[in-house]
Amino acid sequence: FNTNTQMTAYDQDRMXXXXLPVENVRVALEENTLIMKNGVLKVAVPKVKQEERKDV
């Protein structure tokens, strides 16, 4: 999808949005992975293990 062009009705029908509920989960944002393959975006955000947490 190119944001520089006008969206067609076809593009609008194909757009999807998803929200994922995230409760008290710590994630490693610097280790996330985004892969676009055949028009499908796959997102992997690993959880931080309890012993790896650096917060106070």
Curated annotation (Swiss-Prot):
Belongs to the small heat shock protein (HSP20) family. It is found in: Mitochondrion. One of its GO terms (cellular component) is mitochondrion. Induction: By heat shock, and under other conditions of stress, such as increased salt concentration and starvation. May play a protective role against oxidative stress. This is Heat shock 22 kDa protein, mitochondrial. Keywords: Mitochondrion, Stress response. It comes from the Eukaryota.
